[in-house]
């Protein structure tokens, strides 16, 4: 079965996600719900959260030629979408495939733990104080090892620079983490060999002290198409991560008391 297309709705919070799902479920449309995945109640192993609806298209008249093809609808909160945007951005600039369950173990663990922490902020997953302390400690450690804040800020900056370079078919991005320098150069289609040579030299020069990526304009456009309103904008992800890392014992205790007060009596 093939996809006819898809759409994504980004809403304020988790109650709004379920309200929208209810609207789809009770709406007056002819399409048949073929599959339903609640990744908020049961997140994917990599930490992905959201709701996915797969409908079989049912049309009339000229539209009947598409009958049986699938339409995928994704529902996410703003924070869940910020997390997914950050994953896509890191994949692009570090040449990994975290989204596909591959890539560096530390990055995968970081995003998985960040997803857990973000779910606590959104009150979708109550969590004891000890567990929150463990998650915060893990995020502090992984954020430091991966230099997350500096990298994400620089990736967003790199995208802005890329969009200022016209008539390029490839972009060479060099992020020097030691000297905190970012360099972006564009190469035309005729300069592909030169771009590859410069890339190899930059990789040798920076080694483990930075990120070097040679990215095609097609890949940049693909990311822009997938995230048109948040293209490589990791601002909300960083702000949410900051909020988690600011957890203090009193705040954690208050949140735990709030959770316990809402539990039904046994």
Predicted feature residues:
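A short, exposed loop/beta-hairpin motif centered on an aromatic-Gly-Thr core
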Residues: 181-190, 213
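A short, charged, amphipathic alpha-helix used as a generic interaction element across diverse proteins
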Residues: 191-206
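Helix N-cap motif at beta-to-alpha junctions
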Residues: 12-16
């Amino acid at each position: 079965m093939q996809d006819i297309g898809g759409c994504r709705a980004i809403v304020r919070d988790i109650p709004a996600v379920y309200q929208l799902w209810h609207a789809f479920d009770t709406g007056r449309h002819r399409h048949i719900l073929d599959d339903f995945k609640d990744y908020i109640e049961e997140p994917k192993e990599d930490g992905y959260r959201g709701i996915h609806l797969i409908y079989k298209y049912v049309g009339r008249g000229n539209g009947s030629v598409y009958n049986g093809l699938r339409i995928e609808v994704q529902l996410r909160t703003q924070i869940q979408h910020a997390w997914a945007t950050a994953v896509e951005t890191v994949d692009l600039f570090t040449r990994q495939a975290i989204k596909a369950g591959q890539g560096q173990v530390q990055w995968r663990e970081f995003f998985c733990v960040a997803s857990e922490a973000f779910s606590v902020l959104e009150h979708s997953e109550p969590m004891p104080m000890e567990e929150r302390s463990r998650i915060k400690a893990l995020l502090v450690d992984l954020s430091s090892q991966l230099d997350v804040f500096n990298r994400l800020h620089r990736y967003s900056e790199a995208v802005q620079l890329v969009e200022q370079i016209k008539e390029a078919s490839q972009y060479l991005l060099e992020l020097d983490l030691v000297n905190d320098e970012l360099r972006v150069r564009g190469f035309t289609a005729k300069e592909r060999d030169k771009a590859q040579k410069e890339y190899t030299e930059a990789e040798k020069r920076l080694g483990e002290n930075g990120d070097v990526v040679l990215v095609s304009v097609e890949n940049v456009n693909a990311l822009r198409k997938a995230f048109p309103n948040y293209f490589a904008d990791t601002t909300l992800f960083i702000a949410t991560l900051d909020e988690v890392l600011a957890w203090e014992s009193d705040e954690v205790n208050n949140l735990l008391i709030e959770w316990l007060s809402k539990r039904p009596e046994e």
